[in-house]
Design a protein with these regions (language model features):
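A basic, amphipathic helix-loop patch mediating RNA/tRNA/ribosome contacts
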Residues: 1-48, 82-83
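Glycine-rich helix-loop-beta junction characteristic of Rossmann-like nucleotide cofactor-binding loops
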Residues: 14, 72-79, 139-142
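Conserved class I S-adenosyl-L-methionine
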Residues: 79-89
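Conserved SAM-binding loop of SAM-dependent methyltransferases across substrates and taxa
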Residues: 90-101
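S-adenosyl-L-methionine
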Residues: 106-159
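A short glycine-rich, Lys/Arg-flanked "PGG" loop and its adjoining helix->strand segment in the class I
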Residues: 158-175
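Short, glycine-/aromatic-enriched active-site segment of Class I SAM-dependent methyltransferases
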Residues: 180-197
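Flexible, glycine-/basic-rich loop-and-beta segments that form/coincide
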Residues: 234-269
Length: 269
C-alpha cells in the first residue's frame, strides 16, 4: 500500500505534523531511499527508507521563516511586547514571536484545532480560534497590541488592516503577507490560483500600500517571503507603522516596488 510522503513522515514520528513534514520536504531536507524528494504528495510504499537531513525547522511551521526574515530585514524587535498573530494556523508566526521575546501572543484564526499543541499549552499564548479578525474589538483583547503579523487567505488585506490597526497601541506595527491571488481580480489569477505576472504583483502591492496609507499606516519596509506559498505563489512582506488619524502619512519605503518584485522573481522563479 502506498501513502503520501508527508503522512509517512508523521506516522514514523519524523515530523510532529503534516505542515512540519511539508516544511522539511520543501526545504530539501527529506531523502527517500537516498534520493532527495521535494513533493509532499508523492506516493511511496510503506517500506521505503525516509531520512531527514540538514537543519530542521526552528519553528512549528515554515511560516515562522517568513516573520524571521521580516524581523531581520526590517529591524523589528519584539522583546517584552504584546503581539497578535492574525491567521495563526499552526502557529509558525506565534512561535517566532515567542522565540524573539514576546511576552504574550494573541493567536487568532477563523479555523479550529490547527494551533500546534506546544503553543496551545504555552501560558504566553491566548488561542482565539473560530475568530474572524474583522469582528474583534479592543474589549475582546483587554489590552492593545504592540505588534501584529497578518497571514490570511481568501480575503483581501484591505478588509483586514483597519480592524487590526484598531487593536494596536498608538505606536503599533504590522508585518503583513501580501498574497497576489487574494488581491488581484479573478481574471488575473491563473490555473490553480497562481499569479505569475510581475506586473500584477506590483499592482497588488501598490494597492495594499496605498490602502494602508489611507488608514494612517506608514509603509516602512518591503521585501519578499523567503519561501513560496503552497501552490507556488510568490508572497511579499510589508512593514507598516501606525500614525495618528488625520496626520499626513508618507511612503517611507526605501526600495521601489518594481525592484522588490524583480528581485523576488529572480531568486524564486
Amino acid at each position: 500500500m502506498k501513502k503520501r510522503l508527508d503522512m509517512l513522515m508523521m506516522e514514523r514520528a519524523l515530523a510532529p505534523s503534516r505542515e512540519k513534514a511539508k516544511a522539511f520536504i520543501m526545504a530539501g531536507d527529506v531523502y527517500v531511499d537516498g534520493q532527495k524528494e521535494d513533493k509532499a504528495g508523492t506516493m511511496f510504499p510503506e517500506t521505503v527508507k525516509i531520512e531527514v537531513r540538514g537543519n530542521t525547522l526552528p519553528y512549528v511551521s515554515r511560516g515562522g521563516l517568513k516573520l524571521e526574515k521580516a524581523m531581520k530585514n526590517f529591524d523589528v524587535t519584539l522583546d517584552s511586547k504584546i503581539c497578535m498573530d492574525v491567521g495563526a494556523s499552526t502557529g509558525g508566526f506565534t512561535d517566532c514571536m515567542l522565540q524573539n521575546g514576546a511576552v504574550k501572543v494573541y493567536s487568532i484564526d477563523v479555523g479550529y484545532g490547527q494551533l500546534d499543541w506546544k503553543l496551545r499549552n504555552d501560558p504566553r499564548v491566548v488561542c482565539m480560534e473560530k475568530t474572524n479578525i474583522r469582528y474583534v474589538v479592543p474589549e475582546d483583547l483587554g489590552e492593545p497590541a504592540d505588534f501584529s503579523s497578518i497571514d490570511v487567505s481568501f480575503i483581501s488585506l484591505t478588509k483586514v488592516l483597519l480592524p487590526v490597526r484598531n487593536l494596536l497601541t498608538d505606536e503599533g506595527e504590522i508585518v503583513c503577507l501580501i498574497k497576489s491571488q487574494f488581491e488581484a481580480g479573478r481574471e488575473k489569477v491563473g490555473k490553480k490560483g497562481v499569479v505569475r505576472d510581475p506586473a500584477v504583483h506590483q499592482e497588488v502591492i501598490e494597492k495594499v500600500r496605498d490602502y494602508a496609507m489611507s488608514i494612517f499606516m506608514e509603509p516602512c519596509h518591503l521585501s519578499f517571503s523567503p519561501i513560496k506559498g503552497p501552490e507556488g505563489n510568490i508572497e511579499y512582506l510589508l512593514h507598516l507603522k501606525k500614525h495618528p488619524e488625520g496626520t499626513g502619512v508618507t511612503d517611507s519605503l526605501k526600495v521601489s516596488v518594481e525592484a522588490v518584485v524583480a528581485e523576488a522573481h529572480g531568486q524564486l522563479d
